[in-house]
Each structure stands twice: as structure tokens, then as C-alpha cells.
């Protein structure tokens, strides 16, 4: 699921409310949280393996990525040290590892989803939720 809306609209609060309501464990894979941790390709593979295994053990679980559009940017700013495209190749593997029986949800939050590669959004078959403060608009992509 992708939550999209302007800064301060309550997207992150909605994710926390979902976690609270479901009693779900939150795994935050935001690029700024994992920068410098689990270095290299093997480190990232280990991180994703741990997140998949532990999220399935602690169901219900939510895997959360803030500023998700940065993962799929066409061109990353040279000043951005968080290496946001690090998850790009491995994120589909994470999604494929989840089955319909798993109570694990991947939620991305974005201020500007139009900045990412449109092909990725169209291939994801995800729901796009656009929030303008309290009003929510749900689109099925």
C-alpha cells in the first residue's frame, strides 16, 4: 500500500494508528534508518532476511518505508547520503516472499509519488491512498 499526501497530512500517524489497532509490530525500513547499518550487498540481504523471518513470526506486522518514492527515483541527488535506491532491487523479493496467509503488510509513505519511475507503481498492483489532511482518497492501481 502507498500512502501519498503533503507533509503534515497524517500519513505516518495513520501507519501508527493501523499498528495500534491491529496490535502489529512495526519494522521501519526507511532509507535514513538503515544508512550505514548492514553494509554491502550481503548486509542488506541479511537485514531483509531478518525482517521477513521476524515479521512472519510476530504477525501481524507492518513493514514501513517513509519517503518511499526515493527508493525508485530516476536520479538521486548527490547531497543525499542515505542511499535511498539501496532497497530497489531487493524490495520485490521481500514482496514475493509474503503469501496471502501471512499477516504482514508493506506500507510506503510518499510526499511526491510522481517523482519515482511510473513503471514501478504500475507493476506493483498496490493501492494508492492520497490524503489531504483528514480526507482520504483511495485509488486501485
Regions found by a protein language model. Give the residues of each.
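Walker A/P-loop NTP-binding motif of AAA+ ATPase domains
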Residues: 1-141
Amino acid at each position: 500500500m502507498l500512502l501519498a499526501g503533503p507533509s503534515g497530512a497524517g500519513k505516518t500517524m495513520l501507519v501508527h494508528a493501523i499498528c495500534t489497532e491491529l496490535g502489529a509490530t512495526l519494522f521501519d525500513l526507511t532509507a535514513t534508518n538503515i544508512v550505514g547499518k548492514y553494509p554491502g550487498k550481503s548486509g542488506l540481504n541479511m537485514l531483509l532476511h531478518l525482517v521477513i523471518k521476524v515479521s512472519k513470526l510476530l504477525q501481524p506486522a507492518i513493514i514501513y518505508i517513509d519517503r518511499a518514492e526515493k527508493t525508485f527515483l530516476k536520479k538521486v541527488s548527490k547531497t543525499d547520503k542515505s542511499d535511498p535506491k539501496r532497497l530497489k532491487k531487493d524490495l520485490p523479493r521481500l514482496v514475493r516472499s509474503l503469501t496471502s496467509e501471512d499477516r504482514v503488510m508493506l506500507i510506503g509513505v510518499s510526499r511526491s509519488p510522481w517523482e519515482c519511475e511510473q513503471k514501478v507503481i504500475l507493476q506493483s498492483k498496490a493501492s494508492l491512498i492520497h490524503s489531504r489532511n483528514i480526507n482520504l482518497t483511495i485509488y486501485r492501481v
